[in-house]
Amino acid sequence: MGDDLDAWAEACDRLAALGRRLGDDDFPGNEADRADGVAHVVEQTLCWLGWSVFHADPRRPSFQRQNDLITQWGGPNADNVYRHARVEPGRRYRVRGRMHSCQEFILAIRAGFMHLPTWGTLVEITASELGIAEGDEFDFVVGEGGQVPLPDGALTVSIREYYFDWSEAEPALFTIECLDDDAGEPPARRTAAATAAQLREGIDGVAHSAEYWNTYMREKAAEGVANTFAPAFALDKGLDAARYSFCFWDLDPDDALVVEVPVPPARYWTFQLYELAWFELVDVADRLSSLNHTQAPVGGDDVIRLVLSHTDPGVANWLDASGRRTGLLTYRAFWTTGEVPTPTTRIVPVAEVAAAMPTGTALLDAAGRAAQMTARRRHLAWRFRT
């Protein structure tokens, strides 16, 4: 066989081995979690083989959307669209488009993805810093002489689009093109060696993702105390704008976790739910698995209060554990101007949540909850319409 066919056979063998690996003791053992894991490997295969095989040429970049409703990895933000284009230092790229309903973006020049041996944020700049606002058209250059530098070691131009209010409206449009003279030349036909290298890079991405994030979640859970938030941290080599606080929950069916925290000195904050091992969002379209600063009513004392439970307690700020006894509740604060307070927690019976909350706590009945979920699904249909 040729090298490309050998690489294909290797990839298939490694996928089969990864499927068997999901049955090992350090991965979740119950049937539902294992089924989620098999689906997760399918997602990773789609994501990383697609990236390596079809987004391989920095002369012909295009944005690959990741961490949407399908290709999730590494704890995606429910308020984001993620896009990545492969680039090469020394080249120049033009990024154009229109914000439409996108309210902010972070453009990061990255050395690679977090689960790979080489990764990290090299450059970070926001739409606001580029003078771009909701509804605006934009046109800027990445590379020498442009608005965004492209340093040595760069692999991707990565975009995180922010949708704070989840409206039913057109999402952002991004295009990218290489401006170098040789970018106008048609690429050569595929070679066996190039395809083999792309397949091997892609299957490495699949395997690294599944292994890395399972280990990451296990280690983070072991560092903390169940149902308690750890102090907020900045991720080394991550975004300067971001602070994260983790709470790994462990709740009986009739338990409710009441969370309280003063409003942080931040432009944006959000609470979101994740599956263990796979680090995917708990079903963002059909479960109330995220609340941000525009969606969660805040008390008159400037304290955020929310409830995590398996059944709806009737308060507006509810997060749906969706029958998962364990999982990760992440608190994000972005663009901070001071210390981010650590949320406090207490467990109460879900039937007693109303009595445990202050007078004036915002409530939501079944009809209101149904309307809330319908609005979320309609927004997501717009955001991920293609």
Predicted features along the sequence, with ranges:
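A compositional/structural signature for long, glycine/proline-rich flexible linkers
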Residues: 1-386
